[in-house]
């Protein structure tokens, strides 16, 4: 049978949590973040080291975000990345990281700390 997909063995049997950069914490990004947290719980229950997610988003929560994204009125004026990561960390007991900034758009500007095993973009503009 022809192999269609390839998964690096490091992702299947890692020694450390798989690092994930999630770029954007709006409508799609907030949902993806929540599901990554649920996936992390499942992976850990199966003996996998789980995930370590860094969320990048420079935006703040506005009234237009309420209802369309996973934010409430108490979140108004807060940075989206800080707000969402704090909520996830408190709920699931994680130590994931918020970066209230844009992800570097030029690869030569990317420092080691910005690299991850998986990068997911959830933005509507660049």
Describe the predicted segments one by one.
Residues 1-126:
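Adenine nucleotide-associated cytosolic modules
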């Amino acid at each position: 049978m022809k192999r269609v997909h390839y998964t690096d063995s490091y992702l299947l049997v890692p020694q450390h949590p798989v690092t994930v950069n999630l770029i954007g914490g709006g409508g799609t990004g907030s949902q993806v973040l929540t599901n990554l947290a649920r996936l992390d719980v499942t992976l850990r229950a199966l003996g996998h080291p789980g995930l370590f997610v860094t969320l990048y988003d420079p935006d703040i929560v506005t009234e237009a975000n309420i209802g369309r994204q996973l934010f409430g009125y108490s979140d108004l004026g807060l940075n989206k990345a800080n707000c969402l990561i704090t909520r996830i960390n408190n709920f699931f007991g994680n130590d994931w990281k918020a970066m209230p900034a844009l992800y570097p758009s030029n690869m030569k500007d990317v420092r080691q700390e910005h690299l991850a095993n998986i990068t997911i973009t959830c933005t509507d503009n660049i």
